[in-house]
A protein has these predicted regions:
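ATP-driven catalytic headpiece of P-type ATPases
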Residues: 90, 309, 433-476, 506-587, ...
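Conserved ATP-binding TGD loop and adjacent catalytic N/P-domain core of P-type ATPases
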Residues: 16, 29, 268, 342, ...
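Membrane-embedded alpha-helical bundles of multi-pass transporters
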Residues: 111-125, 154, 173, 412, ...
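Transmembrane helix-loop-helix hairpins at the membrane interface
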Residues: 87-241, 352, 717-722, 728, ...
């Protein structure tokens, strides 16, 4: 989508006019104009010049955005700055000064007996001329309304400024006529006529209308500026400079001068300037700016780093991999900006109304004046009713109802690592009825981990893991990697083996010293060693839970069982429960066999499991599910891209730095399943806000216009002074924008769910029962200084198979460890002290 800046728009009628004009250009397939950001997104083959010419012909200005490829975030932020409010504030102050003087002379002496200069006393012509002069000054100060309004009228596309210009102009024009008529009467000596014409002055109404509309415009402009705060805060994150290595020396250069392949250094406390790979050093990096996750992430050689994240502790030497508009931050900014330039389907009705709103209002005003004149009312009464209709009508409230909510909602998502690619995605996500979850990497971590260690008689857990690690050290199987990582996390160093063999039928063998080590699946090992019934039953039980049991033996004697599984993420059950609580049916898609799939599905608490689905078959399953409701597909965006595209809403989870996933309409930066219900909640809140805004905008005009026209005057005697009509108009748009800003207070994850998870399945019940036998230990630890220290200790402790969870506080200097089975204090102590912290006591 090509982006353009559009100038000269003042209301929804303007944006509708521009959109209509550009849509007619040959080669344009779609066009979306945002009054909120004064921008336009165009898709198609039309040239920039053709599009700009179409906008100019419609009476507005346009220029392509980012004409320079290396446009910095700072320049984009400058373009988003609120330049309008300061101008309006100056206009308002000047208008109020002259309005106060005008009101003093026009009403002060009559209503409150305030003194007037002797030269003015009883000199009605001089008083009228002074009022006209003061009104002209106020009209000149607010000439933008007249220039924009009448220019738009000449182009055949009247806008809100046209209504204001006609209303204030009619008041001024009729008052000027009355002034000259009064002068003629005074020359003739007809004092009764003079007094009559004096009461026909509406100079103060014209001035008050312009001033009140300026008040409303200033409030609206200020509030609109707030809606882009999230986008501007992202842009402010972009570093301005980088320290790169050139000719062996460190030099500071502007961010635009950094090129792919450059070597840059980052010291503690500095922001990382561009995306890169760590070549040297280790540190903890705070990525909250991009992901919303406050816990720092460890980085070492080979780790990727992203622009705008903060290096908290160590020195890093990195190679730039993505610079300029290719960095993760730039892609996020572009995604949020593009989404703001698109329109949600719900906005179509408002756009249709906005396109004909102003001509309709002008017609109603003319009819109102004619009807009251035919009804026998004087010209002053009829004109006041017509002017009231003009100045109370507000197309801006209609035009802003949707885009302001979309902008705020999209910004809220970006702050929480939830990226909506366009307004359609933000609207559709909230209508989801079925969520289909890919298993691997979505419900589960996507990486096998050791879950159970069951030593045979005569062996300890450490003995068994030592044997397993030694045997698996030469294997390249994914399950071997899980065993090795667990051994490393628990401080087990491998012993050298020789004569390693990967045997047919899922088995391994090697020699350690004089001992023959064997390992493999239960079926294979039963052919090699004697396995007792209890161990066989335990292996069967673990397999039913979706785990892979691995049996190990030494010298043909069974040493025990180690279970490995792709474990579900910690937040998966809570996320699934939240989705079900929201009335959404949750389905898991996986290529696993039915037994493993059902075990994982039961742990996660999904409504239905569809097993044995190959990657190419997921798209067909999504097509079937769409027959039963609106479907959101959640996956990694790689092997399930066709399914994401087929779904009503494709959600890519765990995107990390690769946020530009074409197949997905919603991108979750973090690998958190709880962000799925959060995205849907945010979408629903945004939709609700849009409905509120549209209701207010339609309700205001439906009620206000008849009241201004005097429909209720014959029945109740109600009539609306044009000044009050202008005041109402000035507040209507402000109310819509302010309501949208309430979304900033919305909590995307909501309050903690204290309701019981519905209908627990047998596997879930079993897990619940086992929790009753868990025990806790409190470790007192010295040396923890920050959140990074907490994360390091927590990660180390939770790597132990006996540890269910660890709650760590550097402020209290404690770690409360929840255990599923007994573990020696020495093991816990060693685990923490290997991370360079001191354990003083364990309760």
């Amino acid at each position: 989508m090509k982006q353009y800046e559009v100038t000269g728009m003042s209301c929804a009628a303007c944006s509708a006019r521009v959109e209509k004009a550009v849509s007619k250009v040959p080669g344009v397939t779609s066009c979306s104009v945002s009054l909120l950001t004064n921008s336009m997104g165009v898709e198609g083959t039309a040239t920039d010049q053709e599009i700009v010419n179409a906008v100019v012909a419609a009476g507005y200005g346009a220029a392509p955005k980012g004409a320079k490829k290396e446009q910095t975030a700072a320049e984009e932020e400058e373009a988003l700055k609120d330049h309008e409010t300061p101008k309006l504030r100056k206009r308002l102050i000047a208008s109020v000064i002259f309005l106060v003087v005008l009101m003093y002379f026009s009403m002060g002496h009559m209503m409150w007996g305030w003194p007037v200069p002797a030269a003015m006393k009883d000199n009605h012509v001089a008083m009228g001329l002074l009022q006209m002069l003061l009104t002209i000054i106020i009209m000149v100060i607010n000439q933008k309304f007249f220039v924009s309004g009448f220019t738009s009228l000449l182009h055949g596309a009247p806008n809100m400024d046209t209504l204001v210009a006609l209303g204030a102009g009619a008041s001024f024009g009729y008052s000027t006529y009355a002034l000259f008529a009064m002068t003629g009467a005074q020359v003739r000596g007809d004092m009764d006529a003079v007094m009559g014409y004096m009461h026909e002055f509406y100079f103060e109404s014209a001035a008050m209308i312009l001033t009140l509309i300026t008040v409303g415009k200033m409030l609206e402009s200020h509030a609109k500026g707030k809606t882009t705060d999230a986008l501007k805060s992202l842009m402010r994150l972009a570093p301005k400079t980088a320290t790169v290595v050139r000719d062996g020396k460190e030099v500071t250069v502007s961010i635009a001068e950094v090129r792919q392949g450059d070597i840059f250094v980052v010291r503690p406390g500095e922001n990382i300037p561009v995306d890169g790979i760590v070549l040297e050093g280790s540190s903890a990096v705070n990525e909250a700016a991009l992901t919303g996750e406050s816990i720092p992430v460890d980085k070492q050689k080979g780790s990727s780093v992203s622009a705008a994240t903060t290096n908290q502790s160590g020195f890093l030497r990195c190679e730039a991999t993505r610079v300029g508009e290719d960095t993760t931050l730039s892609q996020i900014i572009k995604m949020v900006s593009d989404a703001a330039a698109t329109k949600a389907p719900i906005a179509k009705i408002a756009d249709k109304v906005s396109g004909v709103f102003v001509p309709t209002v002008i017609t109603i005003a003319v009819i109102t004046i004619m009807v009251w004149l035919l009804a026998g009312k004087d010209i002053g009464f009829a004109l006041a009713r017509g002017i009231s209709v003009l100045v109370i009508s507000c197309p801006c409230a209609l035009g802003l109802a949707t885009p302001v909510a979309i902008m705020v909602g999209n910004g809220m998502g970006a702050k929480n690592g939830i990226l909506f690619k366009n307004a359609v995605a933000l609207e559709n996500a909230g209508k989801t009825q079925i969520v289909a979850l890919d298993k691997t990497g979505t419900i589960t971590t996507g990486e096998p981990r050791v879950t159970d260690i069951l030593p045979a008689e005569g062996y300890t857990k450490r003995d068994l893991m030592q044997l397993a690690a030694d045997l698996e050290s030469s294997s390249e199987h994914p399950l071997a990697k899980a065993v090795m990582e667990h051994a490393k996390a628990t401080g087990i160093s491998q012993t050298a083996v020789h004569d390693f063999q990967a045997l047919p039928g899922n088995g391994l063998s090697a020699v350690r010293g004089e001992d023959l080590l064997l390992g493999g699946s239960i079926s294979y090992m039963q052919q090699k060693v004697s396995v007792d019934a209890a161990m066989t039953e335990q292996a069967k039980k673990l397999a039913e839970e979706g785990k892979t049991p691995l049996l190990f033996a030494k010298n043909h004697t069974c040493a025990g069982l180690v279970a490995v599984a792709d474990t579900i993420k910690e937040d998966s059950p809570q996320a699934v429960a939240k989705l079900r609580e929201m009335g959404i049916r949750v389905i898991m898609l996986t290529g696993d066999n039915e037994r493993t799939a059902k075990a994982i599905g039961a742990q996660a608490g999904v409504d239905e499991v569809i097993a044995g689905v190959l990657p190419e078959g997921k798209e067909a399953e999504i097509r079937k599910l769409r027959e039963h409701g609106r479907v959101a597909m959640v996956g990694d965006g790689i092997n399930d891209a066709p399914a994401l595209t087929r779904a009503d809403t494709g959600i890519a989870i765990g995107a990390g730095t690769d946020v530009a996933i074409d197949a997905a309409s919603v991108v979750l930066v973090k690998s958190r399943l709880r962000d799925v219900p959060a995205a849907i909640r945010l979408s629903r809140a945004t939709l609700r806000n849009i409905h509120e805004n549209l209701f207010w905008a339609f309700f205001y005009n439906v009620i206000g216009i008849p009241l201004a026209a005097g429909v209720w005057y014959p029945v109740f005697g109600w009539k609306l002074n044009p000044m009050f009509g202008a005041a109402a108009m000035s507040l209507s748009s402000f109310c819509v924008v302010t309501n949208a800003l309430r979304l900033n207070l919305f909590s995307v994850h909501g309050k903690a769910n204290k309701k019981a998870v519905p209908a627990a399945k047998p596997t879930e019940m079993k897990i619940s029962e086992s929790e009753e036998t868990k025990m806790t230990k409190t470790m007192h630890i010295e040396g923890m200084m920050c959140g990074h220290c907490e994360a390091t200790v927590k990660k180390a402790l939770e790597a132990l198979p006996e540890v269910t969870s660890a709650e760590v506080s550097h402020e209290a200097g404690t770690a409360v460890v929840t255990l599923s089975s007994e573990v020696a204090d020495d093991v816990l102590k060693k685990t923490v002290e290997e991370k360079d912290y001191k354990v003083t006591a364990i309760d």
